Amino acid sequence: MYAKALQLELQERGIPFVAEQSVRVKYKGQFLGTHRLDLMVNEAVVVELKAVYDINNFHIAQMLSYLKASEKPVGLILNFSRGALDIKRVVR
């Protein structure tokens, strides 16, 4: 539900985004698989949506992997679990 609500808000504000975008993961030039990004906003920011107790190092490492695969410098982890929205900015 959080994803759909955020997509609606972005759409109403005219902010371009792609939901569930697949990005290729490569290692030494070889294709290994894909990551599926929750949102790519404005072709610049990777957004990952969570509903967890706390954002931890695993979530940050996951975002860094997404940033590397998508070749984007900035990502946001949005955690909806604790009543108030928790936002963590991650820079590659």
Regions found by a protein language model. Name each.
Residues 11-29:
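A short acidic/basic microdomain associated with nuclease active sites
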Residues 17, 37-55, 66:
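Conserved catalytic cores of phosphodiester-cleaving nucleases, focusing on short active-site segments
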Residues 50-92:
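Nucleic-acid nuclease catalytic cores
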Residues 3:
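Nuclease catalytic cores
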